[in-house]
Amino acid sequence: MMKFALKAVTFGVLTAGSTMVMAEDAPSFYGITATGSVAATTDYRFRGVTQSSNNPAIQGGFTFSHKSGAYLSLWGSSVDFGVTGNSTETDVALGYTNTLKLSDTLAPTYDVGIIHYGYIGAGHSFDRNGIGYDGKNGLDFNEVYGKLTFANSLLKGDAISVGVNYSDDYWANSKQFWYFNIGYSAPIADTGFTGLASVGYNKFRNKDALAVVAGGLVKMIAILIIKWA
């Protein structure tokens, strides 16, 4: 989580984790399907900043999708920012996805929506390492997003995605925030694994408020993450 424009780049490999996805071919009820996932990861990182103080995290979520393209997602994870009173993140997203036919050969999938990031038990003010923080919304914030995904772009089964996220009062009262990202995924032969790479640029208005909670680990804007799932 972040919201300012520093000129630093970081590269990394996503920490190992295991994920179980349920109901791949979920039955439909009145046009609605439900899918879920459970994951255990050695470190929960969000846009380059650890959300679990470099410790393991347990995560899980459900998505309810309608045949029209509308969906509702519920997701949660254990978190640890090194402050008293918060150990759980709960996110709720409401969105819409469909195909945008640009030509006979170009039809990307678009995904737009709004998401609420909630942090149960997080207070509106606290002190970390002698640095005070006082924000009207605590750690909670809302964000709107949009993404285009181009399937089978370079290889069969691959995908290129470009997206943008915006919040008018980002995490820890760090004010206006923009996040731009591009990603690529492709199957690894016939192994059943998928390789993914992504680059993101985070622009914040108020980096100082974020640094209090993130413990100063915010000197990064462009992030390259390579992971296998």
Q: Model regions: which residues?
A:
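Cleavable N-terminal export/targeting peptides
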Residues: M1-T33
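Short loop/turn motifs that connect adjacent beta-strands in outer-membrane beta-barrel proteins
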Residues: M22-T33, G69, T99-T109, K136, ...
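Short glycine/proline- and aromatic-enriched beta-strand/turn motifs that initiate or cap beta-hairpins
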Residues: E24-D80
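Residues that define the transmembrane beta-barrel architecture of outer-membrane proteins
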Residues: Y30-I32, N54-I58, N86-T90, P108, ...
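Transmembrane beta-strands of outer-membrane beta-barrel proteins
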Residues: A34-A40, G60, A70-L74, V92, ...
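Transmembrane beta-strands of outer-membrane beta-barrel pores
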Residues: A40-F46, G76-D80, N98, I114-G121, ...
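Outer-membrane beta-barrel translocator domains and adjoining extracellular loop/strand segments
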Residues: F46-S53, V83-E89, A122-N137, S167-F177, ...
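Surface-exposed loop and membrane-interface regions of Gram-negative outer-membrane beta-barrel proteins
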Residues: K67-N137
